[in-house]
Each structure stands twice: as structure tokens, then as C-alpha cells.
Design a protein with these regions (language model features):
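C-terminal-of-GTPase-core extension/linker across diverse P-loop GTPases
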Residues: 41-116, 122, 197, 208-332
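Switch I (effector-binding) loop of TRAFAC-class P-loop GTPase G-domains
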Residues: 93, 100-106, 124-156, 164-177, ...
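Switch/coupling subdomain of P-loop NTPase systems
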Residues: 1-54, 62-63, 317
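Flexible beta-alpha connector loops of hexameric P-loop NTPases
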Residues: 21-25, 67, 129-131, 161-171, ...
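Short amphipathic alpha-helical segments with heptad-repeat character
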Residues: 23, 30, 34-37, 41, ...
Length: 332
């Protein structure tokens, strides 16, 4: 029977969905690079199959040889061009990150399995209108917005691409520029759909990808677990989750991004996490650098101060991200 429909393997299907969701030139280029890289790996197999049909395996220089070389050359040329474009994208992103280092705001990144509700949470916290739908890979391109915590601490919240189990290698390589935004965050909020029947498996899949990126619970960047969609749980399951979160050694925040439940707790937890991670350091600052002195008083806590004739000796407490920003100011 002729069904007249496209047949795709898992990787091709994921790439096709990514292609349908891409909304920026960068996203389109990243998907195209992944598709071509995967297509190139399949060229030899497809042409070998054709040779078998034609009975051409018994001699060199079969009918498919010239065509496969031409196909490979065209694909390689396009891949080379795309890599150059995306290399420039990564360079631009690096410049933007360096610029943000001078802005005294920690970066909080939302990570999680696809369709876990990250964009809905992002919109609920920032009042933005980022595209969010009940579908796979609704977000491909990182989006950032400013947000003020209850203490008055300002942060930058970043919404990122959703993960999936056994994410194809081609996609990880192609989306390197996007994934780098995750590695530069000060805190990761791991959002997962607690109502999903495979919630624990999805959680493990995300942690595995983060681990491959060098981000673990033992790393400098803390990972806070945010269990979303508690509004979809029945009373018994909700009680179970509440008991489990209260007994856990690690901080677990239960929320409903859709209804707003638990968002105040999430924000206050971020406040606490940022404050407890502050580092103490000593610096000598010349009186001529009054702007940096004002910046320190605005961003950190001055524990001890001793004024000299030409400089001031300070013992201060700063968030790790602000320590890096202060070092950039002092070295610029």
C-alpha cells in the first residue's frame, strides 16, 4: 500500500521540528547545519544501497561515485559557510556577555526538558510575551529580560532551548552558541514537569546533558530544582510532592507557572541563594576611581574600610558574578 507520507528516523524528526520552530536567522542556520551534518553522514549508506540495486559493487567507479562526490562537495561547502557564520554569532555573543559583565546583575538561566513550561514561567516572572505553547521545542533562541527580586536585587533571567533524551550529536554541536548562554549563568533553574509520567527520567536526561557541558551539583554554578505544573496533580500526589520537598536536603521549589502558585517562594529562594554565595575580598582602590567605589557600595557590602592619602583599603562582600565584574573594572 502506498501511504504517500514522509518516513523519518528519530534524528531527522527532531531536526525537522527544530526547523519548524526556528524564528531567528541564527536558529535557522543552526538547524540547517545540524541537518547537513546528519545528511552528510548518510550519503555513503544511501549511495551504497543504490549501487546494490544496480549491481555495481563489483568494480570501482560505479554510477553513483561522481554524484556522491558532487553531493559531498556541495554539502561541505555549505557546512563550511554556516560554521563561519555561527562562529561570528558566538563571537558576538561573547562580546555581549563581556558587556554584561560590566552590568552588575547576576544571570539566572531556565533549563529543562522540552515542554516543561520554561517559557510560561519566564513570562510569568518578567511579564513578557515570549512564545510559549504546549509543544516540543517551542523555544530555540535564548531570550533575556531584567527582573527585580523582593530584596531589590536586580537579575537577568534567560530562557533557553529545551532538552530531550539522547539529543543528537549534530544538534549539540550546531547549537553550541545557544548552549553557551547556559554555561555563563550564575544560577540554573532546572524546570521540569512534575505531572509528566516520565518526570524522573526527563530530569535525569537534562542533568546528563548539563553534566556533559561541565555543569553539575558540585560545580560553581548552583542548580535549583523547580517542579512545575503542580496544578495538574491530584490531592494525593500534591501532598506527596510537598512532603518530599520538605524532607529533601536539596532545595526543591514547587510551582505552577500557569496559575502563579509558588512564584513568590521561588523569587525569595533566589534572593537567599544569591546572598549566601557572596564572597569576601580585600582590595586597594585609588581615590581617583570614585566610580568603582560607588559601584562597590551599590553592589556589595563594605565590611571594613581604611582611608589612606592616595587610596582606600576595603574588605568587601560580593556575589561571585560581581567579583568577576569588579576584576574587569579594575583591569580595564
Amino acid at each position: 500500500t502506498d501511504w504517500k507520507c514522509k518516513v523519518l528516523d528519530r534524528t531527522s524528526l527532531i531536526i525537522e521540528i527544530f526547523g519548524a520552530r526556528a524564528r531567528t536567522k541564527e536558529g535557522v542556520f543552526q538547524v540547517e547545519l545540524a541537518a547537513l551534518t546528519y545528511q552528510r553522514s548518510r550519503l555513503v549508506r544511501s549511495w551504497t544501497h543504490l549501487e546494490r540495486q544496480r549491481g555495481g559493487l563489483g568494480f570501482m567507479g560505479g554510477p553513483g561515485e561522481t554524484q556522491i562526490e558532487a553531493d559531498r562537495r556541495l554539502i561541505n561547502e555549505r557546512i563550511s559557510k554556516l560554521k563561519k557564520v555561527l562562529k561570528e554569532v558566538r563571537r558576538t555573543r561573547a562580546l555581549h556577555r563581556n558587556a554584561r559583565q560590566r552590568i552588575p546583575y547576576p544571570i539566572i538561566a531556565l533549563v529543562g526538558y522540552t515542554n516543561s513550561g520554561k517559557s510560561t514561567l519566564f513570562n510569568a516572572l518578567t511579564g513578557s510575551n515570549v512564545y510559549s505553547q504546549d509543544q516540543l521545542f517551542a523555544t530555540l533562541d535564548p531570550t533575556m529580560r531584567g527582573l527585580e527580586l523582593p530584596s531589590g536585587q536586580k537579575i537577568i533571567l534567560s530562557d533557553t532551548v529545551g532538552f530531550i533524551s539522547e539529543l543528537p550529536h549534530e544538534l549539540i554541536e550546531s547549537f553550541q552558541a545557544t548552549l553557551e548562554e547556559v554555561t555563563e549563568a550564575d544560577i540554573l533553574l532546572h524546570v521540569h514537569d512534575i505531572s509528566h509520567p516520565n518526570a524522573e527520567t526527563q530530569k535525569s536526561d537534562v542533568l546528563l546533558v548539563l553534566n556533559k557541558m561541565g555543569l553539575t551539583d558540585d560545580a560553581d554554578v548552583p542548580i535549583l530544582e523547580v517542579r512545575n505544573k503542580i496544578d495538574c496533580l491530584d490531592t494525593e500526589e500534591r501532598e506527596f510532592q510537598l512532603n518530599q520537598s520538605s524532607r529533601s536536603e536539596k532545595k526543591i521549589i514547587l510551582i505552577s507557572a500557569k496559575d502563579g502558585e509558588g512564584l513568590k517562594t521561588l523569587l525569595s529562594t533566589l534572593d537567599t541563594e544569591l546572598n549566601t554565595r557572596n564572597k569576601v575580598m580585600k582590595i586597594k582602590l585609588p581615590w581617583t576611581d570614585s566610580k568603582t567605589l560607588a559601584w562597590i557600595y551599590k553592589r556589595g557590602q563594605v565590611i571594613k574600610r581604611r582611608d589612606g592619602n592616595e587610596s582606600v583599603d576595603l574588605t568587601i562582600k560580593l556575589h561571585p558574578s560581581d567579583v568577576a565584574r569588579l576584576e574587569n573594572r579594575l583591569n580595564s
